Amino acid sequence: MTPDDTNQTFLRRYVDDYCKALDENYKQDTIRSLEHNLQRDPECTYSANQLVEIMQGKAKLDKFRYYEGKKYIKVVREQYDEREDRWRDTTVHAFIGIAKDILGNVYKPASWKAPATKHVRYSFCKKADLLFLTDPRCVGWAGGYLSLIHI
């Protein structure tokens, strides 16, 4: 195994942890929202039922996964489609470089197929960024932390 293979193996693990952090952030944000709804309207059965499902681990909350391409890993948000009874990709959350010269660089998406490469938002090769990106309290499922104003 070459050093490049080793780096990409570690990167895949980090990206997996990144997706888990985004999942947890989405879950916590959903719980906060539902609890707020219940405070405003204690009779709201929808919010109460949703909270019970989340606590029991039965809720079909949005989740994040990634696809590997030639040059980038694409992190996407999946949503459960009740009518079709399946998960489907809804939005691109971020792109992460896997080519040698951009390894670990995190980019905001410009479109479904391409990143906005003008500015590197974070890098999995920097320890502080790695810790930030794998902490559900730091990343946000909606991607606001990827805007330049927050960097």
Summary of predicted features, one role per range:
Residues 55-98:
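Exposed beta-strand-loop-beta-strand "reactive/processing" segments of non-cytosolic proteins
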